[in-house]
Amino acid sequence: MKRVLLSAPFDKPWSNGPYLETALRELGCDVRRFDFRSSQDPNEQIVRMAQDLSPALHIVWKGEAYLPETLHRLSELGTYSVLWHPDISLPPWLPALAQAADLCCVQSRAMLGPFGRAGIRDPQWLMEGVTPSCFAYDTITPAEWRKYECDVGLIGTVDHVPGYLRRLWALERLMREGWHVKWWGRRVSLLRNPVRAWLSPARRAWGGGPVWGPSYAKACHCAKVLLTLPPDPQAPGGLSNGAFMATGVGAFYLSLYRQGMEEFFDLGREVVAFHDEDEMVEKVRYYLSHEEERRAVAEAGRQRTLGNYTNHHAFRRLFSIIAGRGGPRA
């Protein structure tokens, strides 16, 4: 396999850089990582690394710290650069950087049109998935069961801002219904949130800070229902990798319906969707009282993800795209 230089976030324990790096290594790639967000001078440092290592391929996840000139310099050194953009947005700095890359990929299919109109040549749709080995664990201790066990769990930001506010309301509703609810993520801060969020009873359901890797998998395993409320459910064109992480570790995935999600999962058989709070409550009540069905859905979702939506699938597709465009073969 070719040597790959991976520019991605590694600065937080929950950063996705390690997931991408592990998948590349498991595919046999010689990977050298670079955390551009932690570097004082990322543009010069990445060029020096390319000079020293002579990588055939440079994969940039988001890459907001880079200048277009940097990718041009890497190209002159013989390194093929791929810019992988995960967001449903087109920030002002992005078009010039994407035009400088040899290949640009987007997480959401809905971004193909905006990228093309911005003058970015032949962008490709490439969804980030899950790296299963990063979530493996041997056992769940009694203390961990006490920490994570609940009827309904939610992993992510709970805040007063639009998009995240519906999570606050949903947790409050589930608590009023009498279910044992927990959520994991950054604690609600009085400095960042108005009194409405600070006084919410959902604060009492806080189960702890962000979870990642094995702790993420344990939280998913111990929650009978994993609730997901995407902040942008009407955004078409793909799912976030959070859907594949949750299903990949075997969670029973109950999500606010996101446009197009039936393209990726068989709704009702592999994951379950709802459209409003009343339907959410109805689905929670049903599946909490039908354990065998709940377990069957979780297992079917896990099998679908492991068979189709891992980062190994994503990188194999990426290598195929690159080879088809005359780039280096992995």
Model-derived regions: residue spans:
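Nucleotide-sugar donor-binding catalytic core of glycosyltransferases
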Residues: 1-49, 53, 62-69, 99, ...
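N-terminal Rossmann-like NAD(P) cofactor-binding module of classical short-chain dehydrogenase/reductase
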Residues: 59
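A charged, aromatic-enriched C-terminal amphipathic alpha-helix characteristic of glycosyltransferases
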Residues: 289-320
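Active-site proximal beta-strand in glycosyltransferases
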Residues: 74-88, 105
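Catalytic-core regions built around general acid/base machinery
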Residues: 70-77, 97
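Membrane-proximal helix-turn-helix segments that form the acceptor-binding/catalytic region
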Residues: 88-102
